[in-house]
Each structure stands twice: as C-alpha cells, then as structure tokens.
C-alpha cells in the first residue's frame, strides 16, 4: 500500500504510458505483445454486463463488475503476478523485478463502466497492462524494477479507487450511493476492500 502512495498520483494510468515505457525499456531488444490474445481478452471482458445495444453496463459494485474483476484477476495470475485487493478495493498485481527495492513501474486503468457504456474506455488500458506482464513472463525477461498493474475500482463513479491511494475518502463520500445502488462504503466491502484499513491503501 505505502509504496503505491509514493508512485501513483493520477486517477488512471493510461495505455499510452504503458506503450511508451515498454518501447523505451525494450528499444534495443523489442518484444511484441500478442495482438490476437489482447483482442480476445477484450472481447471476453465485454461479455460481463453486455447490453442489447452492443455496449456494456458494468457499473462499480454490480454483479457484472464483480465478474469482470474475477476475470481480470485470473488473467493477472496467469501472467505471473502476485495479486491482491488493497483496502480501497483496487486490484493490485505485482511482477517482481531484479531489484525489488527500486521504485516500481505502475501501469493500468479501470474496468468499471458508466450505465450503457462502451467496451473500450478503461478496458484497453487494463487489459493491455496485463498483456505487457504476460509478454514479459513468456519472454522470460525480468525488469530491473518491479512492475505493478493497478485496476482502479469505481473510476467512472467518481475516481474513488485512485482517491483512496492519494487523498483518501471522507465519511460523506463513503455514504454516497453508486450507480449500482450500493453506498461507496458497502461497495468497497462487496469487492473485497476494508474500510477500516483505507489509510494503508
């Protein structure tokens, strides 16, 4: 938790940052992600909360959100990451580096959606970050720094996952109702967070 507080100061770390870092790290020995696998995982994720219009309603704390999170966790573990849920309900995957005392490289995004949302906002950043880790594992390439993949919870409902890591949540914010009908407090507990330990996120 503490190490993330020092490294993450934005609401969501987008795919473009992941691609930029990846291109720099492997400029002299380029690795290639598996495009087919990436698209397959994006398609599979889009099934959770899929609506009749071709989009998705995977609002935070809903059953569809929980299923999508389980799917993402499965992919992260397959990619060789040590995965846990922080007290704020964010999914954290860690791929060890050669020197884990070095500051981590953090990438990721979110997978919750607005009601009647699209299939790519947030999803691309999250699934692409996992694909980066999978590519590193398959290539047997270990970074000097640890790599952290973060999937922030409830980004669409008010950036609550990233707020937990930066400024924290007030009692008033914890009682706000989300689009799924759960309060933020109940929602965080529903996805495996721990309200009493938020300061450790």
Regions found by a protein language model. Give the residues of each.
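N-terminal hydrophobic or amphipathic helices/low-complexity stretches enriched
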Residues: 27-56, 96
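N-terminal secretory signal peptides that target proteins for export/translocation
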Residues: 1-10
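Hydrophobic h-region of N-terminal signal peptides that target proteins for export
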Residues: 19-27
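Catalytic-core environment of secreted peptidases
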Residues: 78-79, 91-124, 129
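Sec-dependent signal peptide recognition
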Residues: 10-18
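General beta-strand structural signal in soluble alpha/beta enzymes
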Residues: 83-87, 107-109, 149-151
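Acidic/histidine-rich catalytic neighborhood of metal-dependent amide-processing enzymes
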Residues: 114, 123-201
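A non-catalytic alpha/beta surface segment that caps or lines the substrate-entry region
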Residues: 50-96
């Amino acid at each position: 938790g503490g190490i993330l507080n020092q490294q993450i100061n934005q609401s969501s770390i987008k795919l473009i940052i992941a691609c930029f870092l990846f291109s720099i790290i492997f400029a002299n020995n380029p690795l290639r992600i598996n495009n087919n696998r990436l698209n397959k995982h994006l398609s599979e994720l889009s099934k959770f909360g899929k609506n009749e219009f071709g989009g998705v309603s995977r609002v935070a704390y809903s059953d569809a959100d929980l299923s999508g999170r389980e799917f993402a966790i499965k992919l992260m573990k397959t990619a060789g990451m040590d995965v846990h849920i922080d007290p704020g309900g964010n999914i954290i995957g860690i791929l060890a580096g050669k020197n884990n005392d070095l500051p981590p490289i953090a990438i990721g995004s979110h997978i919750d959606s607005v009601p009647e949302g699209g299939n790519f906002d947030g999803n691309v950043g999250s699934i692409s970050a996992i694909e980066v880790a999978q590519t590193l594992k398959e290539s047997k390439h270990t970074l000097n720094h640890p790599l952290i993949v973060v999937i922030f919870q409830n980004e669409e409902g008010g950036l609550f996952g990233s707020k937990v890591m930066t400024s924290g949540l007030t009692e008033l914010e914890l009682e706000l109702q989300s689009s799924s009908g759960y309060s933020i407090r109940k929602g965080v507990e529903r996805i495996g967070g721990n309200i009493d330990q938020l300061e450790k996120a």
